[in-house]
């Protein structure tokens, strides 16, 4: 999607309140990708993305900014936590697995696009498979009259199938089942093993299953995709997208920083993770299920609160690979008020719509919203600052009884005012010990 930095920021304003500096830097970084793709291939190789380090406490919008943009622009995007990785040689996930995760995200993205583009062909394939089971084909040598009768019956059955009249009927279908897919406890790294067994033909088998037609439609989607879509071109496009448009969001980067004033036995392992991360961020080749992926032009966005450490505690080489730094603002009561009122699908709108399903019309007057924002802001100041996430806790506590007794208010309108907010939350916020457990 070809958007100018101003248009990108305008889009983000609908979802993330404030944080103008962060929005501006990310908008420029994404626009530079578009600019790079307009250059000659030789020059494209020399221009590397300027990776970003976002500094700010939890709940201020670091992840949301990156996630919203990636989704809007159709970029492969993954969010990982730096603290979940271990140094090579230790038990746990190694840093290369984040690149493999990005490859999978790109593959799923392209597959979904192709499925949508070829929806009619896929639906026709599934339809024909089900109709074969409902009305098996006639043997050869049948009279023209019988063939005409069969054709008419088939069209009637097709109409019923399309209208959903047969959804509850049961049929037996044959589907491919991979033995690795049936075990959810296997680690993601088993993806490489899955590719190997596919090649040698082990681990996948056809199984017959009885199911309702509406379930059979979903079960046959993968098989239809495998048969109709060009898998090699999908992999090729996914590899290209991951290399040139991929975004890896590394959260909790501060957790692997070695604080100069706090050395402990885990520090060597933390520094080891940083050193393992360095070649990935600098640019290297990683083997994935879609081919060898070059990380040279992936955009890395690292983020952390840096309460117990500071960016300078990262190893110098890694610091140099994140040249763009932006500090995000903490959210005061005014910002929290805007978060409750401005976004398209604001928190208050979400709660109102949820209770609307119970035929209850819920409204918040302006004074109540301001009081909610004040209480959330005060809780953040007096306890740990968790940003906008505090609003979830505050509103849940405020509406707890109403949600429980919603059926009693069916067909009525319920207005939340300042008095109700003070009654429900006032005593809790005044009692600090109690507030720590409830808010």
UniProtKB/Swiss-Prot annotation:
GO cellular component: HslUV protease complex
UniProt keyword list: ATP-binding, Chaperone, Cytoplasm, Nucleotide-binding
Transmembrane domains' residue ranges: none
One BP annotation, GO: proteolysis involved in protein catabolic process
Keyword Plastid: no
Pfam families per record: AAA, AAA_2, ClpB_D2-small
Residues reported to bind ATP: 17, 59-64, 251, 317, 389
InterPro entries hit by this protein: AAA+_ATPase, ATP-dep_Clp_protease_ClpX, ATPase_AAA_core, Clp_ATPase_C, HslU, P-loop_NTPase
Example GO molecular function: ATP hydrolysis activity
Localization terms from the record: Cytoplasm
Protein origin, superkingdom: Bacteria
Family matches, as Gene3D superfamilies: 1.10.8.60, DNA helicase RuvA subunit, C-terminal domain (1.10.8.10), P-loop containing nucleotide triphosphate hydrolases (3.40.50.300)
Family: Belongs to the ClpX chaperone family. HslU subfamily.
Complex formation: A double ring-shaped homohexamer of HslV is capped on each side by a ring-shaped HslU homohexamer. The assembly of the HslU/HslV complex is dependent on binding of ATP.
Function: ATPase subunit of a proteasome-like degradation complex; this subunit has chaperone activity. The binding of ATP and its subsequent hydrolysis by HslU are essential for unfolding of protein substrates subsequently hydrolyzed by HslV. HslU recognizes the N-terminal part of its protein substrates and unfolds these before they are guided to HslV for hydrolysis.
PANTHER family per record: ATP-DEPENDENT CLP PROTEASE ATP-BINDING SUBUNIT CLPX-LIKE, MITOCHONDRIAL-RELATED, ATP-DEPENDENT PROTEASE ATPASE SUBUNIT HSLU
Protein name, per record: ATP-dependent protease ATPase subunit HslU
């Amino acid at each position: 999607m070809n958007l100018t930095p101003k248009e990108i920021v305008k889009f983000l304003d609908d979802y993330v309140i404030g944080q103008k500096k962060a929005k501006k830097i990310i908008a420029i970084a994404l626009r530079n990708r578009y600019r790079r793709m307009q250059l000659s291939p030789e020059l494209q190789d020399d221009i590397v993305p300027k990776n970003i380090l976002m500094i700010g406490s939890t709940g201020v919008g670091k992840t949301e900014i990156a996630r919203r943009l990636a989704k809007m622009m159709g970029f492969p995007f993954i969010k990982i936590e730096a603290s979940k990785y271990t140094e090579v040689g230790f038990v746990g996930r190694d840093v290369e697995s984040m690149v493999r995760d990005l490859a999978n995200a790109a593959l799923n993205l392209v597959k979904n696009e192709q499925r949508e583009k070829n929806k009619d062909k896929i639906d026709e394939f599934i339809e024909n498979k089900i109709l074969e089971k409902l009305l098996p084909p006639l043997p050869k040598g049948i009279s023209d009259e019988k063939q005409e009768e069969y054709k008419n019956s088939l069209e009637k059955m097709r109409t019923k199938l399309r209208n959903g009249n047969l959804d509850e009927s049961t049929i037996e279908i044959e589907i491919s089942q991979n033995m690795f897919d049936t075990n959810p406890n296997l680690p993601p790294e088993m993806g490489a093993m899955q590719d190997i067994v596919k090649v040698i033909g082990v681990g996948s088998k056809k199984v017959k299953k009885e199911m309702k037609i509406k379930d059979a439609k979903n079960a046959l989607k993968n098989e239809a995709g495998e048969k109709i879509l060009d898998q090699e071109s999908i992999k090729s496009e996914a590899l290209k997208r991951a290399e040139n448009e991929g975004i890896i969001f590394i959260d909790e980067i501060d957790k692997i920083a070695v604080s100069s004033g706090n050395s402990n036995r885990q520090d060597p392992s933390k520094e080891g993770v940083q050193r393992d991360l360095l070649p990935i961020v600098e640019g290297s080749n990683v083997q994935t299920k879609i081919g060898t992926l070059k990380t040279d032009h992936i955009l890395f966005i690292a983020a952390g609160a840096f309460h117990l450490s500071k960016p300078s505690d990262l190893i110098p080489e890694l610091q140099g690979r994140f040249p763009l730094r932006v500090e995000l603002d903490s959210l005061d009561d005014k910002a929290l008020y805007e978060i409750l009122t401005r976004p398209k699908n604001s928190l208050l709108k979400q709660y109102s719509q949820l209770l609307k399903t119970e035929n209850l019309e819920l409204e918040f007057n302006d004074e109540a919203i301001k009081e909610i924002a004040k209480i959330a802001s005060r809780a953040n100041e007096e306890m740990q600052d968790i940003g906008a996430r505090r609003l979830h806790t505050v509103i849940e506590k405020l509406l707890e009884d109403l949600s429980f007794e919603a059926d009693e208010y069916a067909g009525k309108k319920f207005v939340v005012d300042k008095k109700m907010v003070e009654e429900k939350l006032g005593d809790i916020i005044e009692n600090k010990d109690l507030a720590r457990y409830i808010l």
